Amino acid sequence: MTFPTTIHATVGQSIIHKTTRLFAGCVADALHELLQNARRAGASRVDIRRLDRDQGTILRIRDDGRGIVDPTKLLALGESGWESDIARSEDPAGMGVFSLAGRHVVIRSRTADADDGWQVTIPPQAWESGEPLDLVPAVIAKGTEIEIELSKAWTDELAQAVKSAAQFYPLPVFYGEERQAHESFLKEAARVENWNGCRIGVFLDKYTPHREQARINFHGLTVPCRLPHVHDADGGRGWYAKVDIVDAANLQFVLPARKEMVQNPALDALREACEAAIFRTIAREGHHRLSYAQWLRARELGVALPEAAPFLHLWTPRIAETNDIFPGERIAGEPMVIMLTQSANIEQCVDRALKSGDGLRGSLVRAMPEFAGYGWYKAFPRVRGLSFQVETDNETFHYDDGASVPDDLSSGRVDTITLELAVRATADSEEPADILAFPADVLIIPTDCCSDLDDVAILLGTDCAITPGELASLLEASCFWPNEDCDADSHYTQQAACEMQARFAANMLLLGEDAAVLERVREAIRQHVTWLIPKDRAISMHAVNHLVEAAFADNDDAPSVDAAE
């Protein structure tokens, strides 16, 4: 077999037989393409009408632009026929008319310098067959008029499609006698900048825009595009950009339908320009809570920002259910000590230990690693490590996040529990950390990542005076983690079960087995039995070995009434 010496790109003639698949086949695509052509032709307005005729429903689109100069290029796939200025600035593909492919279409047009207009009728099969179509004279004012036979689907979608197409379109659009609403694509922008033939609008929203939200507007044609979103490190505020393209030839759309942007250096430059515009908007406000990394990025883009506002939030312990960090009240202008983040059970026990006294010489605040690098953040003392030292008759061990515990560890009283905090004076300090010790009375040690309190060791100091209710609440906050499997009980049911188990465990440890069992029985009766008892009636019960006896008691039997309650 002999191979050719060269090859080159060509367009196969068979592509003409696939023109009905170049666009999605919806009326919205067709309207956008025809409106763009009217704008390029210099029209001052576009009139759209729905005509109900005997042969069906017709969509007529009329503009007063320059008209179609060369009708031979009308159906030439890839030949736009536009003058060089428009070809340079807008990159027309010469495919827009094929958004009508497969439909019965009549096109009339006349240029300003022509004595007569012309008309061509395109039957549905002609779009793919390539058959010759006759041009005939037509009486028409300057401009172009297109009539399209509507299917039921296009008829149903037409009104909304016209409204959407006209929303950001720069020319007046009339549907029947009614002018369609128009608004600026950058409406409600906090600030607008001009950049390389574009207008960049900066908007305030702490949430990242949805990936399908339109971020770029091309004369009424809007597309989603990934553009920068900058937000405060603590989620208070956010900024994002939208772009109105005016004349930017290097920003290109994927052809033919222009529903997404071509990923090229021009788009990369636009993203960087949007980012810089956001930082300039923030600079004008004079304050921010950006991360140190974002602050450095602004400097790279030539935008000088002050350091983030120097405040932090009071440290509050996490709960296992969400594992989220909930900021406490704002702390500023006073001594602070930055607390590192630990698992929920450790944070809950640390919080209880530290409430017994101060000793830290400052408010304990939640760490914000995003601020590491700012001068004011580096200057605060910080907890660099912590552990609980537990002493029993037989041994001493330390417990911290990730530490192993003795295999035979079980719930009960121990000699002492001590919280040890390693505190460093500043982030850059080369001095050894100070070790601060605080007496603790409770330590909860889960041995598995679940809500089963049977796998939790509860250690109490000798002098611990915690109540059963307090201990039950501490257990739930430290250990409850709902099972989200599809076959699991509801969140409410799981939480109720955990609460009951926590109360039982607390009663067992603090009151003894008999008291714990009796309280659990009372709770079960209150929850599952009392609603069956008629109002103002009393029932006495006797239960042993799964045998339950019950009888109505006299109404004046106060003990029975009290027990039922």
Regions found by a protein language model. Give the residues of each.
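Bergerat-fold GHKL ATPase/HATPase_c domain
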Residues: M1-A43, D54, T72-L75, L255-R258, ...
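Flexible, glycine-/charge-rich segments associated with ATP-binding catalytic modules
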Residues: M1-P4, V105-S109, Q125-P172
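Short beta-strand-loop-beta element adjacent to the nucleotide/active-site pocket used for signaling
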Residues: D52-L59
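Flexible ATP-lid and adjacent glycine-rich G1/G2 motifs of the Bergerat
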Residues: R66-S129
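Long C-terminal appendages of very large multidomain proteins
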Residues: D358-R361, K378-E565
